Amino acid sequence: MTDYLLLLVGTVLVNNFVLVQFLGLCPFMGVSSRTETAIGMSFATVFVMTLASLLSYLVTTYLLVPLNLEYLTTMSFILVIAVVVQFTEMVVHKTSASLYRLLGIFLPLITTNCAVLGVALLNLRLQHGFFESIIYGFGAALGFSLVLIMFSAMREKLANADVPAPFKGTAIAMITAGLMSLAFLGFTGLVKI
């Protein structure tokens, strides 16, 4: 049980997918201008990453390895992610039309979020078991969500701040992301995974 908790904390804080491994930067910059959009994207990403990690493990263990089709790993993971995203899009459309409109193009873009594919491939490379794969995917999604929501709150504050003209917009956002990354470096050594 302690190993699972350490894996979760390590994935969320120490090896954060956005600030340490630099995966998922496109949605990180694209969806972070408003906090409500970031929260919606976070829920969708948590669901997709966790489910994609689970299904990728099952596809690898019960389909690709027994049939000696390991060379199709990346392609099969992309297919699994696309199916999970389509399912998520249908669920969000049925349950919350306002969130569906708010997320707009960003929901289908989860398919191309390299963090989702990165989680599946890292699960395979790190030889995680069933529960470890789920926890790793969930932790990566929680870390992504934490950083995305924090960053969106900071960007909303910066929109109302007196920022010099050359730094307005993307420039100050990149500086802020860099400072967040430095702050997360403080967690290095907290957990060895």
UniProtKB/Swiss-Prot annotation:
The family database entries (PANTHER family) matched by this protein are listed as: INTEGRAL MEMBRANE PROTEIN OF SOXR-REDUCING COMPLEX, ION-TRANSLOCATING OXIDOREDUCTASE COMPLEX SUBUNIT A
Compartment(s) where it occurs, according to its Swiss-Prot or TrEMBL record: Cell inner membrane
Q: How does it sit in the membrane?
A: Multi-pass membrane protein
Q: Give GO cellular component annotations, separated by semicolons.
A: plasma membrane
**What protein name applies here?**
Ion-translocating oxidoreductase complex subunit A
Q: What is its EC number?
A: 7.-.-.-
Gene Ontology terms: biological process? electron transport chain
Q: Which UniProt keywords apply?
A: Cell inner membrane, Cell membrane, Electron transport, Membrane, Translocase, Transmembrane, Transmembrane helix, Transport
Segments spanning the bilayer are: 5-25, 39-59, 72-92, 102-122, 134-154, 171-191
Instruction: State the similarity comment.
Output: Belongs to the NqrDE/RnfAE family.
Q: What does this protein do?
A: Part of a membrane-bound complex that couples electron transfer with translocation of ions across the membrane.
Q: Report the source organism.
A: Colwellia psychrerythraea (strain 34H / ATCC BAA-681)
EC category name: translocase
Q: State one Pfam family annotation.
A: Rnf-Nqr
Describe the protein's quaternary organization and the partners it interacts with: The complex is composed of six subunits: RnfA, RnfB, RnfC, RnfD, RnfE and RnfG.
What's the superkingdom here?
Bacteria
